[in-house]
């Protein structure tokens, strides 16, 4: 019987030869030891393992030794004395051998000889009934190293020591704190580690981190060659950084300091002038903003008044419909009263006729039939009037729904009459244009038109309003303050409001693109163009570079834009 896929009970039993000679603990049929077998016996005491009994009983219903009758396994009794006696026999642990039997058994030579590992193997002698529990907890069992990449197989009691020294153990660099380096590659890592301390390449005897070497040379190293701090102002001496203080102490730099002071004073004056100009422009912008706010408020009031006029008209129509319905109700009530009075008069006449002419029953009957016909007609007329009233109620409800729809249509008039134009302006060779005009320049896009056609079904007339536009791009803004400005310039746009949506495209990251929207009219002093829409301060002009994503590899700047024209003037239809 196998202990596991590598060992049988025969491999570990003590005194196996003695047990084999006695045959007391072997099945007399299959001749195997009764390890992990259920033993059954007949009434005469002849025993065998359960597997052999089942095979034999399929052929003959009798004991294999004494031939006594046995119908099934249920006629047999369990032989616990033999099972328990074998469980008390002693054996070795399977981990008392070396690990040759613990390699991949698919490639194992079946004839390999078991070798005792006297130095490192398990030395315990165990009862057979305790073998499974011991194997599970044995400290001498073979295990694999837990570190990724290490194929070492060793005993459990030496695993901890091995894993601490294993070359595949992940270690943390004490310089850069990275923790994904294995122990045997730590030296190679130190040769590349950006935080590993190395000597200055200019031999200044200072240890610096590898990635800070250039910064040390540029800013701190005493052996670096530097220029005099007044180099730009006339002192053209170069020296080591350690000699700078002696140079400043020994050489008179008052003349060069005077030049520096003059330049700083000049820049300070220019800065004050620029500041004054900016203040003026800000004040002018605030005034322009107030004007735009007033124009917006006026436009808002006009729109509200128009909506109110339309609503008032619909309210009057509804009131007229209600009056019409009220008149119809009165007419219906009057008709009903007239019908009742006529019926009463006819009935009275019939009664009198009956009282006066009891003898002439046939004539009375005819008169009665006539009055019945008249009543039927009156009933039909009443039913028609009721249907008329129901139709009027439906018309009233329909009028209310139409009024609501007209209100919604009025709210959508601006968007329905709007003209839309979408395009993009690509400025090629942007960097070259900037170099040619370092102080800033104005770039104008090609002109474009936004057309509107109003077709009237009752007339073969087409009114075309041509709106001419172009985009103006100011490299340094309107006031040369190193801020990009973009405006839409409009012509022939009398009686319209314009919405201008512009996006400065970032080709590296779309989320960094700058988008703005204007819908306010702005009067400008240009005699050629009537109106303009845009923004003065979009982005610093010096940020428009390929590295920042605003320019493509072939030096192009892309501006996407949309133009909407809302026509607020609706002329009445005439036919």
Swiss-Prot record:
Where's it found, cell-wise?
Cytoplasm
TRAF-type zinc fingers: which residues? 133-186, 188-245
Q: Which keywords has UniProt assigned to this entry?
A: Coiled coil, Cytoplasm, Metal-binding, Repeat, Zinc, Zinc-finger
Which PROSITE patterns does the protein's record reference? ZF_TRAF
Main location (coarse class): cytoplasm
InterPro entries in UniProt: Sina-like_RING (IPR049548), TRAF-like (IPR008974), Znf_RING/FYVE/PHD (IPR013083), Znf_TRAF (IPR001293)
Instruction: Kindly name one Pfam family recorded for this protein.
Output: zf-TRAF
Q: Where is the MATH domain?
A: 420-563
Q: Name one GO cellular component term.
A: cytoplasm
Which portions of this protein are annotated as coiled-coil regions?
A: 275-401
Source domain of life is Eukaryota
* Zinc finger map (RING-type): 27-67
The record's CDD domains line, in alphabetical order, gives:
RING-HC_SIAHs
Q: Which GO molecular-function terms appear in the entry?
A: zinc ion binding
Q: What is known of its domains?
A: The MATH/TRAF domain binds to receptor cytoplasmic domains.
Family statement drawn from the similarity comment of this UniProt entry: Belongs to the TNF receptor-associated factor family. A subfamily.
- What does this chain do? Probable adapter protein and signal transducer that links members of the tumor necrosis factor receptor family to different signaling pathways by association with the receptor cytoplasmic domain and kinases.
Its recorded name reads: TNF receptor-associated factor family protein DDB_G0290965
């Amino acid at each position: 019987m196998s202990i596991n896929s590598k060992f049988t009970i025969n491999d570990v039993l003590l005194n196996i030869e003695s047990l084999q000679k006695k045959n007391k603990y072997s099945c007399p049929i299959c001749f195997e030891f009764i390890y992990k077998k259920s033993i059954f016996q007949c009434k005469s005491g002849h025993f065998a393992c359960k597997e052999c009994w089942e095979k034999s009983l399929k052929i003959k219903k009798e004991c294999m030794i004494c031939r006594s009758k046995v119908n099934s396994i249920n006629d047999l009794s369990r032989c616990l004395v033999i099972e328990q006696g074998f469980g008390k026999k002693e054996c070795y642990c399977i981990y008392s051998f070396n690990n040759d039997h613990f390699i991949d058994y698919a490639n194992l030579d079946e004839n390999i000889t078991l070798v005792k590992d006297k130095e490192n193997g398990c030395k315990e002698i165990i009862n057979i009934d305790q073998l499974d529990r011991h194997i599970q907890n044995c400290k001498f069992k073979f295990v694999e190293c837990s570190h990724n990449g290490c194929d070492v197989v060793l005993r459990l009691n030496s695993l901890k020591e091995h894993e601490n020294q294993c070359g595949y153990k992940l270690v943390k660099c004490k310089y850069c704190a990275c923790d994904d380096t294995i122990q045997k590659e730590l030296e190679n890592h130190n040769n590349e580690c950006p935080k590993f301390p190395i000597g200055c390449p200019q031999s200044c005897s200072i240890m610096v981190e590898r990635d800070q070497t250039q910064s040390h040379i540029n800013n701190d190293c005493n052996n670096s060659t530097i220029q005099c701090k007044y180099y730009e102002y006339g002192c053209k001496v170069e020296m080591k950084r350690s000699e700078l203080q002696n140079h400043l102490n020994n050489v008179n730099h008052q003349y060069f300091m005077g030049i520096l002071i003059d330049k700083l004073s000049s820049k300070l004056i220019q800065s004050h002038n620029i500041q004054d100009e900016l203040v003026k422009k800000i004040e002018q912008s605030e005034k322009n903003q107030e004007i735009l706010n007033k124009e917006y408020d006026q436009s808002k009031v006009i729109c509200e008044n128009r909506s109110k006029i339309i609503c008032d008209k619909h309210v009057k129509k509804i009131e007229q419909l209600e009056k019409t319905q009220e008149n119809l109700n009165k007419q219906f009530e009057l008709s009903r009263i007239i019908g009742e009075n006529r019926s009463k008069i006819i009935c009275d006449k019939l009664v009198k006729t009956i009282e006066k002419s009891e003898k002439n029953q046939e004539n009375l009957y005819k008169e009665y039939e006539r009055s019945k016909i008249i009543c039927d007609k009156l009933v039909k007329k009443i039913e028609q009037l009721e249907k008329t009233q129901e139709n009027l109620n439906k018309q009233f409800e329909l009028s209310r729904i139409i009024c609501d729809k007209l209100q919604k249509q009025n709210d959508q008039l601006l968007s329905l009459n709007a003209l839309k134009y979408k395009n993009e302006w690509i400025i090629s060779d942007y960097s070259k244009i900037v170099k040619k005009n370092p102080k800033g320049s104005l770039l104008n896009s090609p002109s474009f038109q936004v057309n509107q056609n109003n077709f009237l079904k009752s007339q073969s007339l087409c009114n075309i309003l041509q709106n001419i536009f172009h985009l103006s791009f100011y490299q340094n803004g309107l006031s040369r303050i190193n801020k990009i400005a973009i405006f839409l310039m409009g012509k022939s746009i009398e009686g319209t409001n314009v919405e201008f949506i512009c996006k400065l495209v970032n080709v590296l990251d779309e989320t960094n693109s700058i988008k703005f929207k204007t819908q306010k009219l702005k009067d400008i002093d240009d005699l050629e163009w009537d109106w303009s829409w845009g923004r003065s301060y979009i982005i610093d002009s010096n940020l428009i570079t390929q590295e920042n994503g605003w320019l493509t590899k072939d030096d192009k700047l892309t501006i996407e834009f949309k133009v909407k024209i809302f026509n607020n003037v609706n002329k009445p239809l005439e036919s």
